Amino acid sequence: MPAWSLDRARHTYSIPYWSDGYYDVDAAGRMCALPRGAGGPMLALPEILDQAAAQGLKLPLLLRFSDILGDRLRKLQAAFGRAMAELDYQGGYTAVYPIKVNQHFNVAGELAAQGGEGFGLEAGSKPELMAVLGLARPGSVVICNGYKDREFIRLALIGRKLGLQTFLVVEKPSELAIILEESKALGVTPGLGVRMRLASLGAGKWQNSGGDKAKFGLLPRQVLDLVARLREAGMLESLQLLHFHMGSQISNVRDIANGMREAVRYFVELSKMGCGIRYMDSGGGLGVDYEGTRSRGFCSINYGLDQFAHTLVQPLAEACKENALAPPMMITEAGRAMTAHHAVMVVNVSDVERAPEGSVPTPQAHEPAVLRHLRETHAALGTRPILELWHEAQQALAEGQALYALGQLSLEQRAQLDDLFYAIAHQVRGRLTGEEKSHREALDELDQRLVDKYFVNFSVFESIPDVWAIDQVFPIVPVARLDEAPARRGVIADLTCDSDGRIDTYVESESLDSSLPLHAPRVGESYRLGIFLVGAYQETLGDIHNLFGDTDTANVRMTADGGHEVVRQRRGDTTDVMLDYVGYKLDDLRAAYRAKVEAAGLAQAEAASLVEALEAGLTGYTYLHETTHD
């Protein structure tokens, strides 16, 4: 095996493959952000954490790199620009950000501020629409999706009166009548869109966004009925936008191509019917390579920005030329691809439970046969086939566990059973190799058994809920010591009192594994990990399991001289905030504390000290204090 190096660290944690050039390792082995992309200034995460700590921020800490948001947007726009130039497509492109992906002002507001021409916003609810009406640049595109009542429709039409290009996308046939009534009442011509329910279906965790069973969209007959009603009302020209959506993360570019071909047929047919289609909105689907495998895995993608853009532009360009149709403005709602890279959750390891090392205990008289068998297995490690011995050890362990449950082994003998088994397991692991096909199954099992548990100061349910909900994968990397070979393998568990509060799948060496190479924490130091690509959906979907609340947050912005500053800090939730949220009356809690202290009959000084400690607990951060390791 080659000696450890920075390049090997990059490969071990797959950094070049998932980072898209926004993260790398510096010469000191520190994880760095490159907010302006590959070749730009490198910001060392440990330095940023020190600056944040000096400003009173604590771990777990969400770091946002605002410049990455703008860079992602510009790269997306540039990819469509190149595709349109190559294919001689004159319709233009608008990148629309659906704020459901991350509604926080530091994200949606930052994109709106940097967006300029060729940028718009999408809302799927009344609260989102109210935010968008305030954020949107005059004259920009605003897409209104989702279920709509009369108030939602009226607010969207008011947006059009205020100079925004708001489009009400008809998701259900019943919406049209209300739109026509409200537009007449307000004296405004509506901008209408229709969501088509395509038969094409992408594979993956979000595939129910498309296909005949999709939650939203009109079937072919319903589309024809909509056109007939608009023609009858003399408003066919108001139907200006076609919308379809195949999923939030489409891994296979062929699925994108199939969906676009089907959507283009709708565009051609409706245009020939007299609809004034000027916009083609292909929705979301542009994925993020969380795995770094560039594959069809559900958390990966087998294409890049340029191929994605070309796949959408080409069939529409060809159809416009073949049918002599004016090319429509192309729109995507690629919120995940815009935001995922910009945010990193930094967490600290609170404790480590080492995997049992095993030992060979001193033989005892009248030892149970199962222990003698394990001793013989251990003694034969150098003389018999290694896999045969491993299977015998597994069988003996299972037998011994059953005997203990039946009362036929003592607790001491049960512990000796484990000692012998793990002594065998470590030696077997050292003699197996992944290059030998017959060894791989045993290696996988041993790698799961012989791992340390890293208990980490955060909540999976709050900070990365998709890990629990849909087995989402996020790359995880130590923020320092990457110039040092990791000597342990570990799995990560959070602070919650829930067995689901763990991470089961890790990005490693252009693949996925059930554990991750990690360092043993040093005495007197904090060991910190970065969880990357968490900028899309995770904050909004986070849950307050065990009353762990929002974490501290800091925005990191590049300065004109190539430096950076930590700005727009936001303190995370404190315990009193969380208790108030779930209905506790804080004054009643304080009164209950005081009553219990008084009833305990303590000395005045001790009683005052306890009241002070209770108040500090009530108003403190919901997460643990960062500690160094013993």
Task: Name every feature range the model reports, one short phrase each.
Residues 1-31:
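Charged, compositionally biased N-terminal leader segments and the immediate start
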Residues 4, 317-630:
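Charged (often Lys/Glu-rich) extended helix/loop segments that serve as interaction or gating elements
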Residues 20, 25-98, 103:
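Low-complexity, highly charged intrinsically disordered N-terminal segments
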Residues 30, 38, 68, 102-104, ...:
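Short, glycine-/Ser/Thr-/acidic-enriched flexible segments
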Residues 59, 63, 85-90, 273-277, ...:
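Flexible, glycine/charged-enriched surface loops at secondary-structure junctions
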Residues 88-281, 286-288, 302-307, 315, ...:
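Active-site-proximal beta-alpha core segment in soluble small-molecule metabolic enzymes
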Residues 98, 124, 145, 171, ...:
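Generic beta-strand/beta-sheet core signal
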